[in-house]
Curated annotation (Swiss-Prot):
Full protein name: Bifunctional protein FolD
Family from the record: Belongs to the tetrahydrofolate dehydrogenase/cyclohydrolase family.
GO molecular function: methenyltetrahydrofolate cyclohydrolase activity; methylenetetrahydrofolate dehydrogenase (NADP+) activity
Task of the protein: Catalyzes the oxidation of 5,10-methylenetetrahydrofolate to 5,10-methenyltetrahydrofolate and then the hydrolysis of 5,10-methenyltetrahydrofolate to 10-formyltetrahydrofolate.
Amino acid sequence: MTAQVLDGKATAGQIKEELAQRVARLRERDVVPGLGTVLVGDDPGSRSYVAGKHRDCEQVGLASIRRELPADASQEELERVIDELNEDPRCTGYIVQLPLPEYMDTNSVLERIDPAKDADGLHPTNLGRLVLNVSEPMTSPLPCTPHGIVELLTRHGVELAGREVLVIGRGVTVGRPMGLLLTRREINATVTLAHTGTRNLPELLGRADVVVAAAGRPHMVTAEQVKPGAVLLDVGVSRVPDPETGKGRLTGDIDPAAAEVASWMSPNPGGVGPMTRAMLLVNVVESCERQVFGQP
């Protein structure tokens, strides 16, 4: 058996085409959704990631609002920028690029974001709404990576209702909110949350129908551990030495050999990453639509 590919790039492209049509309808009403980004410092990786978000904006017709601060900016300076974006009607959603300098209080910064403009879907208010709302349509931004994973599976016809899903990793961006989304009644999966301290991980992997690996441990999930026919989503990112070049290269949490056992598997890179960026755009557009049309 060779796993079919959960193609995040192609699926994200489809979502962008759909978003472009929705943005066009908003523009007919003289409304242009806008994505804001706040970047502190000049980290090359962060700068590249932010630039990618603005290229995405251009593809679907969103306005780009960029705010950049020097690496030695104070927390007060950053908070003033956040307050400005909260009040700016051109900005319908924005993100503060992480990580921030160590001397800044990241949680305080993120909590200052207007929940309605929380493009990452990670504001405590929005996560709390996800906890409380099991059955009704969500009317607040969803966490981008978990939402992207569900959308990727749904668009490939992978059934989740009643299936055993193992989530490995307890981070706030993926692991913790993943189960909240999967156990909503409209999805109805049965979820186990594991992490690097889980003692019986091989046993859990052996019975999981779907595995979401987001622990940041290179190849911690092996082909021998995976249930035949399982669906595998590799979210983890680690840098390891390349034996051929001696340089660092990025790798995921799932050994590529597991593709010979799985029924579906997301590539890494090219699987979940593009979906995360697409869901960021979805949050921005939907925030604008809620303002204009009053729809969930």
